[in-house]
Amino acid sequence: MSTSTHALTLQNPIQAPQVTKELSENVILTCLDDIYNWARLSTLYPMMFGTACCFMEFMAAFGPRFDLERFGSIPRATPRQADLMITAGTITMKYAPALVQLYEQIPEPKYVIAMGACTITAGMFSADSPTAVRGVDKLIPVDVYIPGCPPRPEAVIDGIIKLRKKVAGESRQDYTEDLQTHRFHAVRHRMKPVSPILTGQYLRHHEDLTPHHDPLLIK
């Protein structure tokens, strides 16, 4: 061995790195979108908005038999700690402002699951009800629809799985574009303050407040 070769050997005693089996089992190559989506789909914290019997089936999904929390879906009592809204039951005109206000308080990115026929199309109230909203998607955007009257807990779990698949395929760049252009025509609601209607006089006509005079008796 020449002197120059011996010097190079002493200066670089470590050989070129090789991908071994141990290294391949402990190193994961991924991208930022995959890590971000994996964290979000594993922690879909729902905020329930239940107004009718479908909400009972949703509560059964969190029972010990189905245990929906094993998917990382832990119910939250405040919209500021949630990223998923599940609407179950009929949405009335009176409930609509409260529903939109709660939806606006959920931080982005946020998702909505419509559970049951009443919240999707107003159900049996869609024919002649003057107060039922014909679908919650008239107020807020809906990502997953779960039909049924009421849907079984297995259907609720299937809806959560479908939403997880949708989240897994998203990109942060797409999310930024959707946030700028609004993914739904009615996302940004601006409620106008109105005078209170619960004044106690809403059952009486304004003409009943004035005394009635018979024109034949007036001299």
From Swiss-Prot:
Any one biological process term the GO annotation gives: photosynthesis, light reaction
UniProt KW keywords: 4Fe-4S, Iron, Iron-sulfur, Membrane, Metal-binding, NAD, NADP, Plasmid, Plastoquinone, Quinone, Thylakoid, Translocase, Transport
Keyword set includes Transcription regulation: no
Pfam family of the protein (one): Oxidored_q6
Catalyzed reaction equations: a plastoquinone + NADH + (n+1) H(+)(in) = a plastoquinol + NAD(+) + n H(+)(out); a plastoquinone + NADPH + (n+1) H(+)(in) = a plastoquinol + NADP(+) + n H(+)(out)
NCBIfam families, A to Z: nuoB_fam, PRK06411.1
Xref: HAMAP family: NDH1_NuoB (MF_01356)
Record protein name field: NAD(P)H-quinone oxidoreductase subunit K 2
Species for this entry: Synechocystis sp. (strain ATCC 27184 / PCC 6803 / Kazusa)
Gene (name only): ndhK2
